[in-house]
């Protein structure tokens, strides 16, 4: 069964190509700043994706500087409500620091080393 992967701008094209070659679809998702596709806050039950992938800097914005823009908590909320796993590509050596930037990281969010992204994404997609 075809699954859909929402990806933030800059996501590794090799990863996306591998997932397409496995029979999945990809959909660009915008963080609100880059206009890179459907705005992440517009994801709902009718247009939900099966997996979101991206980088920490695509969901993390200094809230005091940009109070009216979507925050990582908005992304986490969407992931929790619709059961969408979020893979954030972070080198293993930086994962603890990345996690400390984001308060209340839900279990549905994983920090994944770049070398493991394809494997982890396929495992999630195959288990759904």
Where do the language-model regions lie?
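Proline-centered loop/turn at the N-terminus of a beta-strand
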Residues: 83-87
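Short, charged N-terminal beta->alpha structural module
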Residues: 1-31
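Short acidic, S/G/P-rich loop/turn micro-motifs used as interaction or catalytic elements
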Residues: 11-14, 33-34, 56-66, 93-95
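A short, well-structured beta->alpha microelement
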Residues: 20-48, 112-117
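Conserved beta-strand-loop-alpha-helix hinge of the TIR/SEFIR fold
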Residues: 47-72, 82
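A charged, well-structured terminal subsegment
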Residues: 114-128
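Hydrophobic/aromatic ligand-binding patch that stacks against planar heteroaromatic rings
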Residues: 77-78
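Glycine-rich, charge-decorated loop segments at or immediately adjacent to ligand/cofactor-binding or catalytic sites
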Residues: 88-106
């Amino acid at each position: 069964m075809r699954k859909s992967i929402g990806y933030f701008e800059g996501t590794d094209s090799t990863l996306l190509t591998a997932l397409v070659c496995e029979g999945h679809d990809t959909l660009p998702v915008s963080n609100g700043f880059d206009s890179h596709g459907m705005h992440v806050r517009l994801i709902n039950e009718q247009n939900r994706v099966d997996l979101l992938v991206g980088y920490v800097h695509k969901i993390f914005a200094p809230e005091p500087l940009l109070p009216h823009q979507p925050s990582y908590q908005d992304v986490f909320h969407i992931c929790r409500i619709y059961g969408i796993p979020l893979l954030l590509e972070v080198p293993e050596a930086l994962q603890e620091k990345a996690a400390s930037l984001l308060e209340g990281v839900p279990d549905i969010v994983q920090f994944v080393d770049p070398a493991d992204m394809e494997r982890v994404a396929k495992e999630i997609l195959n288990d759904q």
